[in-house]
Amino acid sequence: MNLVLSVVFYVCLSFQYYLLGNECLDLFGYNKNTRTILISGFLSTFFLTFIIGFVCQVLHLSWTLYFILQSILFVVVDGYLLFKNRKNIFCRHEIKLQRILKNNWVLILFAGVFISFSIANQLPYYDLNYDDVYYIGKVVNHVGTPHLMNEDYFNGSLVHINGLDLIRVINTYELSYSYFGTLFHIYLPYFCRVTMSLHNYVLFGIVYKQLASLFVKEKYSQYAIVPFFYFLIPAGFLQTGIYECIRVYSYDLWQFQTAAFYGGSIVRMMAVPILIIYSLPLVEKMEFKKIIYIVLMSISMISFSTIYVQVVVLFFIAAITIKCVYCFVEAFKAKETKWMIVSILGILVIVGFLLATRYLNINTEEFVYNVTRYHGFQQEWYDHDSLLKYGFVVFALIFVLSKNSQSRSIVGMVLVLYVLVWKEIFTVLLTITSFNYFFVTMRTVSSIQYLILFFLGICALRIYESIFKKMYFIPNLAAVGLVMLVCVFFRHNVNEM
């Protein structure tokens, strides 16, 4: 029954995402396709849950009152959307299932295989997946509580809060899960571990396919996520038992495989590519309404995890840098000396700011502790990680293979992010923006590792495009590659045992 109700939930949520996402993109002046509409709908829906959830958690209102207020907001918003689109909703639209399957079979396979491995994995049941006790406990215990945020969700004991625990109050996604699970009568642990995990895997595929479409032809874009099947390997949970040269040292990688429903997983898996997708138009032309949309989108993202704060700060630095570079190139082409000078000054200011952070003298015990802990992981993990060690090679290759300024701007943004986390050059900046939590920085590094892995897929596709003008071979190559990948690593792990 949980499976059937989950299907009903997906159908209703798809309509919600499409109608709301379409309205938001029209309102803020974005070009749109089905993928950007769904992504925008996801962000907008959880922005609506943040509005009510944040207020109710701050005021410690009851679950019943929260549920009523949240339902009223959705009824009003959805009622408006249905009324506005009433003519289109009842029109007959031809759905070509065969074309959908052909253009998205890799995404479907990705979501299906990862959710199957996640469900089959026994670690969540034996070890409670490290953080499930807190997050699933919070989702379950929200329901029916007389006062939100009134208990310790690790053990269920009542707490007396003096002041405001801003970090926990901002995170409203657990409350959203409680609301949707209760609304659709889905068993809440199942809703978290299965329903929302599958939702997030599908959304991950949609986000990266949209990003890939900015580099390669539409018909090739789904194949860009093939490298992420690498995370399926049996040894991947702890990244042990495989050759060091192909090992990915990625912090909290187990969450990608077994806890995709975590708010931190959503930020780590999708925040940077989503920021790129909706910030890219601003590189060519600054528009105030698009900046407002990114602010609202950021509020939605921070409702999942406050680790997003560091992500958006570092991304802002990267985006401003690339904006200055873009302006310089355009001014150079137009031979506008004044704007060339302004652009160069902008770049120098950014570089000066970054270099100045290296000389900040912060000697608090907490700061030193987190710098030391991060340094330990740098030596043990990142100095040996192939993606980070040879990242510059990947960036050089994809920059050469990129065919327009738009795709090169994306590469430039990620390159700046890569430089910011490379070899502890800007450790002080990273520690400050992580609010002295070293693991926050490591999760940001994981986001960049995912993008480098994605770029490897793009490089392969661009090379394929240049050699073969048709896509006859690529579906077969992808299928054979996936089978070989799983077989080889299963065989290797059997030998290791």
PLM regions: where:
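Membrane-interface alpha helices of multi-pass inner-membrane proteins
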Residues: 57, 291-308, 317-320, 347-351
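Active-site lumenal/periplasmic loops and adjacent helix-entry segments of GT-C-fold
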Residues: 116-270, 493-497
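Signature aromatic-anchored transmembrane alpha helix within multi-pass, membrane-resident enzymes
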Residues: 340-348, 462-495
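Transmembrane catalytic cores of multi-pass membrane glycosyltransferases
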Residues: 1-5, 12, 127-136, 140, ...
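Membrane-interface helix-loop junctions at the exits of transmembrane helices
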Residues: 48-52, 116-124, 227-251, 351-366, ...
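Membrane-helix boundary/interfacial segments in multi-pass membrane proteins
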Residues: 3-8, 58-66, 128, 242-267, ...
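Membrane-interface transmembrane helices that cradle and orient dolichyl/undecaprenyl
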Residues: 267-268, 272-292
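Membrane-embedded, hydrophobic transmembrane alpha-helices
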Residues: 1-100, 360-373, 412, 420
